[in-house]
Amino acid sequence: MSYDKVSQAQSIIIGTKQTVKALKRDSVKEIVVAKDADPALTASVTKLAQEKGVDILVVDSMKKLGKACGIEVGAAAVAIML
C-alpha cells in the first residue's frame, strides 16, 4: 500500500508547498496525495507532477498519510525523493 511506501522511503518531503519546490528541482520519484485533501491545495502539485511525468499515488486519508510520515497532523501531499 502507498502508506507503506511512504513510511519505508529513505527520503520524503512533506506538504504541498515543499512538494512543488522539489518537483521544480526534478528530484522527485513519485508523489502521494490524500483524496480527502482540499482540491485547491493539491491541484498545483498534481498538475506539476503530470507535466514532469512523475507518478501520482492517491491515498484515502490525510491523517493516515501524516502518520505514515511520522507526524501528528495530516498531510495533503508527500514527495518520495530520488
UniProtKB/Swiss-Prot annotation:
InterPro entries: Ribosomal_eL30-like_sf, Ribosomal_eL8/eL30/eS12/Gad45, RNA_bf_YbxF-like. One of its GO terms (molecular function) is RNA binding. It comes from the Bacteria. The keyword RNA-binding applies. Keywords: RNA-binding. Belongs to the eukaryotic ribosomal protein eL8 family. HAMAP family: Ribosomal_eL8_Bact. This is RNA-binding protein BPUM_0095.
